Amino acid sequence: MKPDILLEICCGSAEDAIEAARGGADRVELNNNLFQGGLTPSIGTLEVVKAEIDIPVMAMVRPRAGGFCYTETELATARADAKALIRKGADGLVFGFLHADGTVDTERTRAFVELAEGRPCVFHRALDVVPDWKRALDELISAGVTRVLTSGQQSNVFFALETIREMIAFAGNAIEILPGAGITLENVDRVVRETGCSQVHLARHRILTDTSVANNREIYYGGCLYPPEDRIEITDREYVSAVRSRLGGSER
């Protein structure tokens, strides 16, 4: 395994990001609500993370769950969030904008690249639903996007290794390809070997218990799935460290 494979960890809280950095992550993607694919983190979360870790923090800008064709109100929210995140020290932005037909909204994409003020910009897995990924990559390159996060238009990277390899070859040095979704300690070697990627994106959590809700097990604060309210997910530092070792490098 090459020692220069960059490890990015997908994080849903300040605790996640701190544990990821301690485990040896090279970069974190900071979100809120990973259950819904990751939404915009709070400014307070970003401030705490920036005060505690010294690796790049890419901040998600996603005002709601679901698709990526936003109303003007949602776009205004995303714009305000992006400006605040940059002002508070985000090292880059992660976003995705599509038209109703699933093609890249280049105008909105370019506008958010400008909001980043020269910092790296990532077009996230919205790429995985575009009808023509080659055309989409060309448009993202033209818009000034630094990197794309992709599962190769499959539910799991492992089912799209050849496509991701094709994406990397097509992109050349014009835009970075970051594989993510379904990468594990057990398959990361093969993902790197068969795609030729130089970086990987993954998440892994362990479960903590919050006993403050133990007095009444009939109460739920979320929607219809009714998850146990005493369970908290946090980045598994030891797992991150194991992946870092597998890729080459050591725990921080």
Language model region names:
Residues A65, G172-R252:
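C-terminal alpha-helical cap/extension of soluble enzyme domains
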Residues R22-V28, I53-P56, G89-G92, L115-R119, ...:
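Glycine-enriched alpha-helix->loop->beta-strand junction motifs that scaffold or abut catalytic
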Residues G12-R22, C69-D81, D128-A143, M167, ...:
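Catalytic cores of alpha/beta
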Residues I5-C11, V28-L30, V57-V61, L93-F95, ...:
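Hydrophobic faces of well-ordered beta-strands that scaffold small-molecule active sites
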Residues M1-C10, K50-A51, N216, R252:
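N-terminal amphipathic alpha-helix/helix-capping segment at the start of soluble metabolic enzymes
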Residues E47-I86, G96:
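Structural motif corresponding to the early beta-alpha repeats
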Residues E15, L34-I55, T73-L75, F97-E117, ...:
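Active-site-adjacent beta->alpha loops and helix N-cap segments on the catalytic face
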Residues K2-V28, N33-T40:
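N-terminal pre-domain/capping segments
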